């Protein structure tokens, strides 16, 4: 029996970098209100960036059986094992498109069939 190897992907927590990003001229505006982050910076308690499939693929390539991540894109959770198992290159756009569709269906499929209804 083999041991379970757990991979960990970090890097999504960017709270400590917010001031650096603002000082570098990145306004980081609210996508709904267009309000710049600087106007509410003192109240921000959490800031996370989405991680794509590449670091998850790298963890799998290093022998992980299970990968624990911070905030990743919804489709990355499907895309990473597909890329790893089938050896898809980062620029194999047709294969990646199929993986994105599969990931999106798995992530949102239940909602499309009524799984997100209150009644």
Report each predicted region and the residues it spans.
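Short, contiguous, pocket-lining structural segments
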Residues: 48, 73, 93-97
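An acidic, phosphate/nucleotide-engaging active-site surface
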Residues: 14-69
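Charge-patterned, long linear interaction tracts outside catalytic cores
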Residues: 56-91
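Catalytic or ion-translocation cores adjacent to nucleophile or general acid/base/metal-coordination motifs
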Residues: 2-14, 78-119
């Amino acid at each position: 029996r083999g041991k379970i190897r757990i991979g960990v992907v970090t890097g999504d927590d960017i709270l400590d970098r917010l001031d650096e990003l603002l000082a570098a001229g990145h306004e980081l505006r609210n996508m709904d209100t267009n309000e710049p982050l600087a106007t509410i910076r003192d109240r921000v308690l959490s800031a996370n960036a989405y991680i794509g499939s590449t670091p998850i693929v790298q963890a799998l390539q290093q022998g992980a059986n299970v990968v624990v991540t911070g905030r990743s894109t919804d489709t990355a959770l499907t895309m990473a094992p597909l890329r790893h198992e089938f050896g898809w290159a980062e620029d194999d756009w047709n294969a990646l498109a199929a993986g994105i569709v599969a990931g999106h269906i798995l992530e949102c499929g239940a909602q499309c069939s009524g799984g997100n209804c209150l009644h």
